[in-house]
Amino acid sequence: MNDSLKAQCGAEFLGTGLFLFFGIGCLSALKVAGASLGLWEICIIWGLGISLAVYLTAGISGGHLNPAVTIALWLFACFPKQKVLPYIIAQFAGAFGGALLAYVLYSSLFTEFETAHHMVRGSVESLQLASIFSTYPAAALNVWQAALVEVVITSILMGMIMALTDDGNGIPKGPLAPLLIGILVAVIGASTGPLTGFAMNPARDFGPKLFTWLAGWGNMAMSGGREIPYFIVPIVAPVIGACAGAAIYRYFIGKNLPCNRCEL
């Protein structure tokens, strides 16, 4: 791995960890510290966290911060194949690190909450706290319905990311693109968050899930109490959705724009 790629992976690690730290910190404040936050406020914090992370990293790595985005850009926007796996590893590691850091700062409040509510980690009831770190679907949704939600919202996310970063599509977005992407995430979260927690990012979900598995929630963290282990859904569905969104943008919008594009 050359020095340039190391720097890019380092940026992906830091950026992914940063927005996870903000998002998990927000949910920790809500659930174990008694903060008063509504759905829109939570979504805005997640969205602005992503915007700030992209601003931090875009000049070095492009600010992917999401394996689904990296894979879609490789398949549909000429991102170099040799960078895909290192980026993804850095993103998963960053997500784990962001979850760990947020937990360290709030650990005493987690312990106090569990003691006060007689909550045992690894029980179904403990998913209430595990959901601070990663996503689980609403009880009324089965695994396949949750997967469909994640495919749809990630396809919207990816299609809009390509539109917002494509200077050939209307007015150049330039420095506004990260902010607009953050607003996009907040809007998606506000409209569909109660269904699945709007993961849209395998690293954002599995990195913290791995942390909770190690931190005492065990298999319950991975399965979500479902017969089909739920951790699979936020890994696979966002990749499918991102590729679908990129393909739709590429073939219905991008190919009709007056600019040069790489050939598949």
UniProtKB/Swiss-Prot annotation:
Membrane spanning stretches: 10-30, 42-62, 84-104, 143-163, 179-199, 228-248
Regulation: induction: By propanediol aerobically and anaerobically, under control of PocR, Arc and Crp. Has 2 promoters.
Phenotype upon gene inactivation: No visible phenotype, not required for BMC formation. Reduced levels of PocR protein; pocR is transcribed in part from the pduF promoters.
GO MF, one annotated term: glycerol channel activity
Mode of membrane association: Multi-pass membrane protein
One GO BP annotation of this record: glycerol transmembrane transport
Keyword list, A-Z: Cell inner membrane, Cell membrane, Membrane, Repeat, Transmembrane, Transmembrane helix, Transport
InterPro entries the UniProt entry points to: Aquaporin-like (IPR023271), MIP (IPR000425), MIP/Aquaporin (IPR050363), MIP_CS (IPR022357)
Cell inner membrane among keywords: yes
Locus of motif NPA 2: 201-203
Cellular compartments per GO CC: plasma membrane
Subcellular localization, as worded in the UniProt entry: Cell inner membrane
Motif segment (NPA 1): 66-68
Function: Probably facilitates diffusion of 1,2-propanediol (1,2-PD) into the cell. Modeling suggests active transport of 1,2-PD is required at low extracellular concentrations to allow maximal growth and saturation of PduP/PduQ within the bacterial microcompartment (BMC); this protein may be the cellular transporter. The 1,2-PD-specific bacterial microcompartment (BMC) concentrates low levels of 1,2-PD catabolic enzymes, concentrates volatile reaction intermediates thus enhancing pathway flux and keeps the level of toxic, mutagenic propionaldehyde low.
Description of its domains: Aquaporins contain two tandem repeats each containing three membrane-spanning domains and a pore-forming loop with the signature motif Asn-Pro-Ala (NPA).
Family statement drawn from the similarity comment of this UniProt entry: Belongs to the MIP/aquaporin (TC 1.A.8) family.
Listed name of the protein: Propanediol uptake facilitator PduF
